[in-house]
Amino acid sequence: MLPDKYVKSNYLKNLRSATNEFLDSNPDLTKSYLYLLLFLYDLEFFTISWVAENYGMNKKNLSDRMIYPLLSSGYLYKHFDKLTPSQTLEDHLFRDETKYNYRVRYAMSQKGRLAVQRFYASLNSPDSSI
């Protein structure tokens, strides 16, 4: 064992144990769902195409296996749907999307944001009990 003066504070040392404890306390989440929520945490909203390209997954697999299950369990929600009316004049004047090329925007719900915050807190605590 190294002396304490050589060991620095690194919250990622708790990553494996914190992940396992977090997933045990949240049975509706899997490790891949958690990683996707961590990826999406700082985004206001997103499209499936953008996430598939930047997350490195096939669009069909991402939507069927990850986005829609997280949507149905309440971790994500539809931020802008095709039927969502715009309320501002600027949106009506400068909108370059029509009903034929419109993509639904998704966002992380409060439940998803709180789950990610709890996970971050468990990484920082030495005794990661969630």
Q: What role is predicted for each listed range?
A:
Residues 4-36:
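Short alpha-helical segments that sit at the start of domains
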Residues 26-30, 46, 63:
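Short glycine/proline-centered loop/turn elements that form peptide/ligand docking sites
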Residues 28-29, 40, 97:
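Residue-level marker of regulatory loop/turn positions in helix-turn-helix DNA-binding domains and
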Residues 34, 38-42, 120:
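Short, locally clustered residues in the helix-turn-helix/winged-helix DNA-binding domain
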Residues 45-54:
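Short acidic, hydrophobic short linear motifs in intrinsically disordered regions
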Residues 56-72, 77-81:
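Short amphipathic alpha-helical interaction segments
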Residues 80-105:
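Short, Lys/Arg-rich nucleic-acid/phosphate-binding segment
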Residues 96-130:
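Short, amphipathic alpha-helical interaction segments positioned at domain boundaries
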